[in-house]
Amino acid sequence: MVIWDPAPANKIPDEAYEYIDYFIPNQTEAQTLSGLEDVLNEKQAMEASKIFLDKGVKSVIITMAEQGGFGYNGIESYFIDIPDDIKVIDSVAAGDAFSGGLSLGISEGLEFKKLIIYGILSGCIAVQKPGATDSMPTIKEFTSLQVKSGK
């Protein structure tokens, strides 16, 4: 299982893409690596995702800051928004928390849509606290936000 967050967005050899199970760039990385002018909305995220799938990636999830995230695996596509009333204090570890939530979902054998939701919820918890290590969500915090948001 290969989960790849391409930060920073440096050129990736085309032959490497076929080994990636979950490719999770942010909007800027998706734009840079796809060659598209912008990846600012769901339509553009789908365009970028198709480019990565054409290169061999199995699933793409683009994190889209305060918009949420977009995922496409060649069969299903989902745009998941963030829960209401998330107050951003520090976004320094949001991507890392997203990856952790996604990984938790994968380890639990969840469906694709739930993987994106797990990542979004984890990132939302992280941005509400300052710092990197201290902002990583606990299971208790994760479960609480999951229940509160209904996701």
Predicted features, each with a name:
Residues 1-47, 67-69:
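Conserved beta-alpha-beta core of the PfkB/ribokinase-like small-molecule kinase fold
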Residues 11, 15, 42-151:
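Conserved phosphate-binding/catalytic region of the ribokinase-like
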